[in-house]
Amino acid sequence: MTKIRGFELVSSYTNQDLLPKRETAHAAGYDLKVAERTAIPPGDIVLVPTGVKAYMQPTEVLYLYDRSSNPRKKGLVLINSVGVIDGDYYGNPGNEGHIFAQMKNITDQEVVLEVGERVVQAVFAPFLIADGDEADGVRTGGFGSTGH
């Protein structure tokens, strides 16, 4: 079967329950879950592991969005507002393309995320290329690895 787009576990995780799913038939987002118990001190930003990687077509991207309940119920926000997972992040030699959520604790108390809690939503989308685009770089990492 040809793979078009989807999720796989990173090799260091075996809990199939971590594979994202949509909760309703009309939901755009796949819920990504916490793969390891994670404590976030007040005011800190922590990379929360999801245990998954995503594959997609060359003209697609995966966006990570905060869950609307995070600020109100947990005191957490996805600090970069929208996470952008490029197709060439999949299979990244540094971490297999493991998706992390950059979460900030906006409370004055430690927030603990337990394994299996839903943390962010992931939405696949197409993207367009501008005229004259000549991008030919090769990904070597994640979280700003292609920046200068």
Language-model-derived ranges and their functions:
Residues 1-148:
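DUTPase catalytic domain/fold
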